UniProtKB/Swiss-Prot annotation:
The lineage of its organism: Eukaryota, Metazoa, Chordata, Craniata, Vertebrata. One of its GO terms (cellular component) is mitochondrial matrix. Binds 1 Mn(2+) ion per subunit. InterPro entries: Fe/Mn_Superoxide_Dismutase, Mn/Fe_SOD, Mn/Fe_SOD_C, Mn/Fe_SOD_N, Mn/Fe_SOD_N_sf, SOD_C_sf. This is Superoxide dismutase [Mn], mitochondrial. PANTHER family: SUPEROXIDE DISMUTASE 2 (PTHR11404), SUPEROXIDE DISMUTASE [MN], MITOCHONDRIAL (PTHR11404:SF6). SUPFAM superfamilies: Fe,Mn superoxide dismutase (SOD), C-terminal domain, Fe,Mn superoxide dismutase (SOD), N-terminal domain. Mn(2+) binds at H10, H58, D143.
Amino acid sequence: HISAEIMQLHHSKHHAAYVNNVNVVEEKLAEALGKGDVNTQVSLQPAFRFNGGGHINHSIFWRNLSPSGGGQPCGDLLKAIENDFGSVDKLREKLVAAAVGVQGSGWAWLGFNKESKRLQIATCANQDPLQGTTGLFPLLGIDV
C-alpha cells in the first residue's frame, strides 16, 4: 500500500517537475539546433535524459497502479513469469532484491526482452529510462 500523500507528492511535485523541466530543455535544444550550436546541444543531454527519463518512468509507474490493486497475474503474463522465474513469488523475491540493491535513486524493472522473448529484471540509476538504457520493454517499474 502506498499512501495518498506519497502519491500526491510524486504526481504534483516530482512528475510535474520532470515534465516542466523537459519542456524547458526541449525549448533550449530547439534553439541550439536552430543556431547550429553543437556545444549547447551536447551540454543539454544530461538534463534531457534525467527529466525526460523521469517523465517516461513516472508515466509507466502511474499506469501500473490501481486503487484496489491489480490482483495476481494471469494468462500469457503468468505463463511467462512461471517460465522465466518459476513462480510469481520467485519473481517478487528477485524484483524486491533488485530494488533493495539500487544505491541512491533509481528504478527496479520487470521488462520484456524482444530478442529472447523472455522477461528480465533490470535496474536503472536515477531517472534513466529502461528501454533507452537496456533495450527492454518496461512492464512494471518500482521507484526507489
